[in-house]
From Swiss-Prot:
Function, in words: Involved in peptide bond synthesis. Stimulates efficient translation and peptide-bond synthesis on native or reconstituted 70S ribosomes in vitro. Probably functions indirectly by altering the affinity of the ribosome for aminoacyl-tRNA, thus increasing their reactivity as acceptors for peptidyl transferase.
Single GO molecular function: translation elongation factor activity
Family: Belongs to the elongation factor P family.
Domain of life: Bacteria
Name this polypeptide is given: Elongation factor P
Source organism: Solidesulfovibrio magneticus (strain ATCC 700980 / DSM 13731 / RS-1) (Desulfovibrio magneticus)
Pfam families in alphabetical order: EFP (PF01132), EFP_N (PF08207), Elong-fact-P_C (PF09285)
The entry's keywords: Cytoplasm, Elongation factor, Protein biosynthesis
Gene, per the UniProt record: efp
Length: 185
C-alpha cells in the first residue's frame, strides 16, 4: 500500500483496476479543512491524462508491474514487435502505448519492458541512441556558426535538430529523454 505522502513524479499507482503514473502533483493545505493533494495522472494503458484529488493520508494500491528484458525486432504497421529474452516469445506493443519512444527503436535493440497483467505498458530506453541521418539539407563548407541548427530526419523516422555540419549518412547520438542532438559518432 502507498500513502499520499509517498507521491512523487513517476510513481505508479492503481485506481479502479487501472495503473496510473503520477505526472504532476501539488500538496494543498487550505486555511479551513483538511489537506489534500491535486494530481495529474497518466493512464498507463491508453495514455490519457486525468486530474484527481486525494485526501492527505489516503491509501493507494501499488500496481502489480513486471519488468522484463526484451529485444526489439521490427515494426508491423501500427505495432512494435518485441521478443522476450528468456522465453523467446514475441509480444506486440501499439504505437499509441509507446508514444514518442517508438521513434528511437532500432532493430536488435535490447531494453526493459514494463508489463501489467502480461500486457506491455511502457519501455525503458537507454539514455542515448546512435542513429543514422537519412535526410537533411547538405552542409556547406564553412558552416560552423555557433548554435545554428537544421532539421534532420533519422533512419527511424524521427526528426531532430542538428548542427549545420551534419550530413546525410552521418551517425549521430541522440538523447532519448529530450530528443536533442548530443554529438557525432
Amino acid at each position: 500500500m502507498l500513502s499520499t505522502t509517498d507521491f512523487r513524479r513517476g510513481l505508479k499507482i492503481e485506481m479502479d483496476g487501472v495503473p496510473y503514473e503520477i505526472v504532476d502533483f501539488l500538496h494543498v493545505k487550505p486555511g479551513k479543512g483538511g489537506a489534500f493533494i491535486r494530481t495529474k495522472l497518466k493512464n498507463m494503458i491508453n495514455g490519457r491524462v486525468v486530474e484527481n484529488t486525494f485526501r492527505s493520508g489516503e491509501k493507494m494500491v501499488k500496481p502489480d508491474l513486471e519488468s522484463k528484458d526484451m529485444q526489439y525486432l521490427y515494426r508491423e504497421s501500427e505495432d512494435f514487435v518485441f521478443m522476450d529474452m528468456e522465453s523467446y516469445e514475441q509480444m506486440h506493443a501499439g504505437a499509441a502505448q509507446l508514444g514518442e519512444k517508438g521513434g528511437y527503436l532500432k532493430d536488435g535493440m535490447e531494453l526493459k519492458m514494463l508489463l501489467y497483467k502480461g500486457q506491455p505498458l511502457d519501455i525503458d530506453l537507454p539514455a542515448s541512441v546512435v542513429l543514422q541521418v537519412a535526410e537533411t539539407e547538405p552542409g556547406v563548407k564553412g558552416d560552423t556558426v555557433s548554435g545554428a541548427t537544421k532539421p534532420a530526419q533519422l533512419e527511424t523516422g524521427i526528426t531532430v535538430n542538428v548542427p549545420l555540419f551534419v550530413n546525410i549518412g552521418d551517425r549521430i547520438k541522440v538523447d532519448t529523454r529530450s530528443g536533442d542532438y548530443i554529438g557525432r559518432e
